[in-house]
């Protein structure tokens, strides 16, 4: 018997082919094009130029610490670019981070020894650090050799020459004119000229230069501090306080605007306000013996003698506060402000009848700073008060 052959199932074969074709498409084409939900989505990398633009905008707004962070991000994106280290160091000088500025300027020089501005900013940063004026002079000369027509470098040289003493003043005068002639549209050339005029007691002209610098960038606290100091010398106290207050608003972490406001209020006899700002300055930088000394003086002016003794003791002898802050004392040298801490301390001791130590302070003042009239008067007052105390005990 012959079997009948079954016809092929064309529909089933077609369906199977379609299934196989779909499976191939799904595995080989569709799936590879889809994002893996278990793999992090890649983040677009920012260019160093975008960080630089951000940093420049922040600097123009006076936001120095955020500007510093933006420049650091630019360096992380392009660590071989020496100009980024220079830009960072420049902002760090304005922010008072002198050691960090020195480090970054040196990093720039390592990357490019012929970067003139790197040598200039290095000199500028060194100039603010005690005992480094000779290094600053060497660095600024190298900067001038590499680029003798750079206005910023000439401006930095003005500041270094001022710190070099009287012999550098005439050269500083010439340099300030060169800097302004090369570029009158940057802050540093006007700032350098203002510092020179201040150093030569031309305070009204110095004020004009600070104001010119502020016109270029109205958001740098340092400029308002300089402006206020010159107003204070001229006894224009309301303008001085206004300038210091603006500096404080721009950089509230800086204790010096508070310090200068404190001293300005003291100069016009408003001792309660002077004490308030002296306390704020110490809160900003509790390990600074100068700020402790000023606070002690203001306590004394307000007749808080025990508190004055405590704070002036920290300024003179150093020590550790109740909060665990370590302070290094200031030795008595020929400086009117340091002498003020010592004779005010002696007076507070005398007024609380602690004459054993008070008389030692008076003798120290008479020996160490004989030409300081205020210190000598203070020593005489200490002796007088202690003599009266002794008579009262008889």
Report the location of each language-model feature.
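Helix-start (N-cap) detector for alpha-helical repeat units in TPR-like alpha-solenoids
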Residues: 48, 82-83, 116-120, 151-152, ...
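Structural signature of tandem alpha-helical TPR/SEL1-like repeats
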Residues: 62-69, 95-107, 128-142, 164-178, ...
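Alpha-helical segment of the N-proximal tetratricopeptide repeat
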Residues: 44-83, 87-97, 128, 156, ...
